[in-house]
Amino acid sequence: MKEIKGDYMINKLGWKIGGEQGEGLESTAEIFSTVVNTLGYHMYSTRDFASRIKGGHSNSKICISEEKINVIDYKTDILIAFDQATLDSYIPELDENSIIIADAKIKPEISEEIKGLVAIFPITDLAKEIAHPIIKNIITLGICSALLDIDSKLFYDMIESKFSSKGEEIVNTNIQAFDKGREIMSEFMAENNINDKYYLKKLNPTHKNMWLIGNHAAGLGALVAGCRLYAGYPITPATEIMEYLFDKLPMVNGAYIQTEDEIAALGVAIGANFAGVRAMTATSGPGISLMTEFLGMAAMAEQPVVIVDVQRGGPSSGLPTKTEQSDIFHAVYGGTGDASRIVLAPISVEDCFYTMIDAFNMAEKYQTPVIVLMDLQLGMNKETVPSFDFNRVQIDRGNLLKQEEITEEDIIYFKRYTTDVLVSNRTIPGQKGGIHNANSYEHSVVGLPSEVKRNTVRQKEKRANKIESALVERPFVLNEYNDEKDILLVGVNSTYGVLNKAAKQLKEQGMKIDTMQIRQIYPVAQAVRDTFDKYRKIYIVEHNHNKQLRTVIASKYHNSEKIASLLKYDGDIYYTHQLVEQLLEEEK
């Protein structure tokens, strides 16, 4: 047996569990991370799983740190293997201080390339002796509790909370399994002189962090923004938004509708907004493709609506459980005619909450569809976030008139689409003096179909110009690490952390790199272009093959030849070393 070298008291830790999908690995990771959150640590997670219910390899990785973390470290300190693929696939992530815990049931073949200490336990056999093979996950938690010196009571409380509804016997059986895991690891640690090398001390945080996925943060943001109707159809990786709002909307007298398809979902949401109710839908690539015609209708009829697109690998059914950022073209340009709309993009789980409030406000302020683009990594994976600041929340319903504000009550039709201003006044059904037509045809100022050339030009220019004038409060986040401006790394969604970590690493090598994370993809903010002017070279980092974000931004920038791309489109997240290697190659 190898002895762990040196004092390895943890201030950050990479924990990974792998095995066959459908065997409860995700539940193990969830219980483990929830307990670690009570210790006061920051965490950031990722999952790799197949588009099936059971079978095939999957894994979950959680990065733990005393400081704020928003990037997955490539290095793995603790690797738990319930299949041979876990032992074979992640060798490059291990070093001499790593510990590998394997289930004897898989008859593990340990490669000579594996660094670190290997512990093989009869986890499944012990689970069978206690109750059932599935309880191996609780034994695993006991193993981790001993290795990291986490108080057993924290896990007991979690087990009690999770299984109390199934009776005292089930609770006691799970506690027995946990204790067995703790016992066998304690014996192993004593035999191998591990002592306190991996202990996670309890911190004393000034506040407790939430442990959330982006989809849930977005759902809560929608509720706080005043969303009172959700219409949708289930699709990976956006379904958690639908499930969250299904549970929460009744608490605020809201309504939830699971429609027959995505087309109907957007139609219902548009109709609710027309009636004055803030409403939304959420989907992914295949779903937003079906919604395209209704997107055009909402743009033509100048109806507010919010659509969340949690991007996955495409095209078509593509890679439902892999991350990608390849719906940017569709979000910005998708549809017939000149159907401009606003496209926002949160940069973190915390920002998913605030971006949804921005989206609902902008949808009504500019009377247009607003698409909130997320990616699978941001939507489905967890991050520790501070409690949301509800004092920051402001509701802006734009030019939606109250009854007393409608001055010409005796007219037959209300001039809903006047071209005298970019954003005209808006009324809802039932208001006296507010009658107008809203449909998919080009129209006059009162909404009646019109093919008059002069009117057509004015209406098209009004719709386009109001979108071009749209600006969210923070269109991007700029991190400046150098006084001298040389290279700017630009990203969107979940790449925020990896861009900043790469910039800091390369600064140590003498490179002068700042980062910009885009929050408003379209329209391209003038401030983005002004910032670009300060740098010698701009690299846009994105998860797609067609350089979609670069194309959108470059089309609005006068010096586009200095914009280059760094791309990754294999379905996996960016790791810092990969981005660093790409950038160094480009800068040769």
Specify the residue positions occupied by each region the protein language model found:
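Gly-rich Lys/Arg/Thr-decorated short loops/hinges at beta-loop-alpha junctions or inter-strand turns
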Residues: E160-F163, E187-H207, A222-C227, F246-V252, ...
